[in-house]
Amino acid sequence: AVMGRNLALNIESRGYTVSVFNRSREKTEEVVAENPGKKLVPYYTVQEFVESLETPRRILLMVQAGAGTDAAINSLKPYLDKGDIIIDGGNTFFHDTIRRNRELSAEGFNFIGTGVSGGEEGALKGPSIMPGGQKEAYELVAPILTKIAAVAEDGEPCVTYIGADGAGHYVKMVHNGIEYGDMQLIAEAYSLLKGGLNLSNEELAQTFTEWNKGELSSYLIDITKDIFTKKDEEGKYLVDVILDEAANKGTGKWTSQSSLDLGEPLSLITESVFARYISSLKEQRVAASKVLSGPQSQPAGDKAEFIEKVRRALYLGKIVSYAQGFSQLRAASEEYNWDLNYGEIAKIFRAGCIIRAQFLQKITDAYAETPAIANLLLAPYFKQIADDYQQALRDVVAYAVQNGIPVPTFGAAVAYYDSYRAAVLPANLIQAQRDYFGAHTYKRT
């Protein structure tokens, strides 16, 4: 409800009159009452709402993904005319979007599955927008979407046509998977600095403030520095009294499931999903901590040196995560015939969305230089960072393992990097085993 309300206010602020409808009459009245003088026109039946719009009608749905979206579409259909456009701005599973696009197209309606990132504030002030569907239908809503989107530092709006049917929602799904990876990498960096150097919350905030001035400059680093010093009403640091169970809404899981369907090694992001799952086993972890032993932890040595190693490890880990995510976008583009523009996708992530970061411009530059590049790690800039920072990543992972600090995503970054650069892997033995017990055959070198 908040996302829908804020998007309506955003659209209204760009000079449009917006018809609003909610199943709950009270919520519809509330939105209008809380925003006096705004060009928000309330309607209390679906028929009146639809009939209030100019044709071709442009209807933005912001409802809970799943059955709710189908119910909303079915309630609209009796009053729609051929050529009308429904935009689904929810966190919808892309296969559902492909199905709805096909079904509505057959009836003469247009359907645009649109990823919207930036949370409640982004919806109001300017989100990153990822529309997918019929190109001609997108052209009819592009003026509105362009006006409400976030604007990057170079003045470019953070919206672009992504591709046919489910492409927009797929890109939003991968965006969310990358977000999981970013957040887990940052959490592991925090754990290392706290466990290895015993940094105070003030020192952590100062460290992240410095990091936010350089390569790691991003929304997530920015909010993390603020989180470290936030206190509750009792004067305690809030982060220290929050239960260590991370919830999830399932979009990270969808990204990992899709990687398995496509045969893409999305190991870092998948580990970040599993890290949330194991965090939720709080009772088991507390019990296990009293039974299972670990190593005696040793201090991490020189403070400034270790902080810099963790910073480098975090940046290279982030690069590996994005390399995996964009590799999966390439595989999906081929599988679903979307013809994705990876440089443009990186561009619209530069503002408005949760993963917005300075380094996204480097991804755009890499694809501009070599559009068909197989993996971002092979681009000159990222290859140079890998050359310069891999030792720090290895040192940090080795320290963590020797001192019993779990670093699933840092570990996944090293494993993926070494596997990807290996001309020969021990998979020949696996294939021999498969042939031995199942006559699966093999290829000779």
From Swiss-Prot:
Metabolic or biological pathway: Carbohydrate degradation; pentose phosphate pathway; D-ribulose 5-phosphate from D-glucose 6-phosphate (oxidative stage): step 3/3
Record-listed E.C. numbers: 1.1.1.44
InterPro entries noted in UniProt: 6-PGluconate_DH-like_C_sf (IPR008927), 6PGD_dom2 (IPR013328), 6PGDH_C (IPR006114), 6PGDH_Gnd/GntZ (IPR006113), 6PGDH_NADP-bd (IPR006115), 6PGdom_BS (IPR006184), NAD(P)-bd_dom_sf (IPR036291), Pgluconate_DH (IPR006183)
Classification via SMART domains: 6PGD
Binding site for substrate: 91, 117-119, 175-176, 180, 249, 276, 434, 440
Keywords carried by this UniProt record: Gluconate utilization, NADP, Oxidoreductase, Pentose shunt
BP term (GO), one: organic acid catabolic process
Keyword Oxidoreductase: yes
PANTHER family reported in the protein's UniProt record: 6-PHOSPHOGLUCONATE DEHYDROGENASE
NCBIfam families on file: gnd (TIGR00873), PRK09287.1 (NF006765)
Function of the molecule: Catalyzes the oxidative decarboxylation of 6-phosphogluconate to ribulose 5-phosphate and CO(2), with concomitant reduction of NADP to NADPH.
Family: Belongs to the 6-phosphogluconate dehydrogenase family.
UniProt protein name: 6-phosphogluconate dehydrogenase, decarboxylating
